[in-house]
Amino acid sequence: MSKLPVISGRDCLKTLEKTGFRLRRPEGSHMVRRRVEPYAHVVVPDHRELDRGTLRAILRGAGVTVEEFIALIC
């Protein structure tokens, strides 16, 4: 299992946008993104650093593996 990087919520969103996620709506300190095909809905907190457990839960909801996510960051 690959080790998750420590990244900000905004960097997480930029990476998820590469997989087809688009802005649904900003909601205070959280940002909601949605992908139509295959359908997925994620809520990402706008924090400077996301906890690894939070990032893992976001990736699970997005249907993206840790390895795919790390490859998209690079």
Question: What label would you give each PLM region?
Answer:
Residues 1-74:
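Basic nucleic-acid-binding interfaces
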